[in-house]
Regions:
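Loop/turn elements at helix/coil->beta-strand transitions in domains of secreted/extracellular proteins
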Residues: 2-4, 71-74, 102-107, 128-130, ...
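A structural signal for short, well-ordered beta-strand segments and their strand-loop junctions
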Residues: 6-8, 77-79, 108-109, 154-156, ...
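Active-site-proximal loop/turn and secondary-structure-junction residues that shape catalytic pockets
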Residues: 9-15, 82-84, 113-115, 137-139, ...
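Short glycine/threonine-rich loop-to-helix capping motif typified by GTGT followed
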Residues: 82-93, 119-131
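Aromatic side chains
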Residues: 90-93, 110, 160-162
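Acidic, contiguous N-terminal accessory segments
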Residues: 108-116, 127
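Flexible, acidic glycine-rich loops studded with aromatic residues
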Residues: 120-131, 136-254
Length: 254
């Protein structure tokens, strides 16, 4: 079909599925600096060597062996976004885990290195070269900064491309029930990345500019569940898909 599934195992944040099983690896006694009502119980404490060893073991289960679940042609997404504890440990973790997984697979991650910055721990070349990054927020990952660092970029900026089914547009044009497809058609350009100085163009066709994507986040769950079905989600996907296709697929097929 010409489509490749990119599996994501999200670490070290958004990792409730792991901290429930291994609570000893959880960040304990800390709350989000953004929301004091949110304890960081979904964060793996990557300042502990045993945590990093467990994360490697998890990825090894999928990427290594005689018949790995994720073969060498599979791009593996490691998440790596919205970590809100011990930025030095996080950046050291990125410097260790990305080259480790690169031994078997292409690595993709969500942008977070602008926000998660201790201003002393540099990200190494091995954790940048040929690594793919979804740009989703200028605050978490300044697009121009990530380009200059050398990451391969996928423009997934929330300002144009984030929808939350049955959402209420927490910000103008983003996080609502549907994308603003008129705005996407009129003004979205995949090679214009969002940075602290506004939208900045990187060269069209640049090897570092892989394209663009939009995201459907089914955040309204549990007590906020709206009763939407998979068919409802598909309709929302199909509403936006041709407009992103128009913007990202050139006549050359690139």
């Amino acid at each position: 079909l010409g489509m490749n599934v990119v599996p994501e195992i999200d670490v070290p944040a958004h990792a409730n599925s792991f901290t429930k099983i291994w609570p000893e690896l959880m960040v304990k006694g800390r709350v989000s600096p953004i929301n004091s009502n949110r304890p960081l119980i979904d964060h793996l404490d990557v300042s502990k060597p045993e945590t990093i060893a467990k994360i490697k073991e998890i990825f090894d289960d999928y990427t290594k062996g005689d018949d790995p679940t994720f073969d060498s042609d599979t791009t593996v997404h490691i998440g790596a976004d919205e970590f809100l504890y011990n930025y030095t440990a996080y950046r050291k973790f990125i410097n260790e885990i990305v080259p480790y997984i690169k031994d078997t697979n292409t690595v993709r991650m969500w942008g977070g290195l602008t926000w998660i910055n201790d201003h002393k721990t540099e990200i190494t070349k091995d954790a940048i070269e040929n690594v793919e990054m979804n740009l989703w927020s200028k605050d978490w990952a300044d697009g121009l900064q990530m380009y200059n660092m050398g990451y391969k970029l996928i423009n997934t900026i929330d300002d144009y491309g984030y929808m939350v089914p049955n959402g209420s547009y927490g910000r103008a044009n983003a996080y609502g029930d549907l994308l603003n497809i008129s705005r996407v058609f009129d003004s979205f350009e995949p090679n214009k990345v969002r940075s602290s100085g506004g939208y900045q163009a990187v060269p069209s066709g640049d090897d570092q500019m892989l394209g663009a994507a939009f995201a459907i986040w089914s955040d309204n769950i549990d007590k906020s569940a709206s009763g939407l079905t998979e068919s409802d989600l598909y309709w929302r996907f199909f509403d936006a898909m041709p407009f992103y296709a128009e913007k990202t697929w050139a006549a050359t097929g690139k």
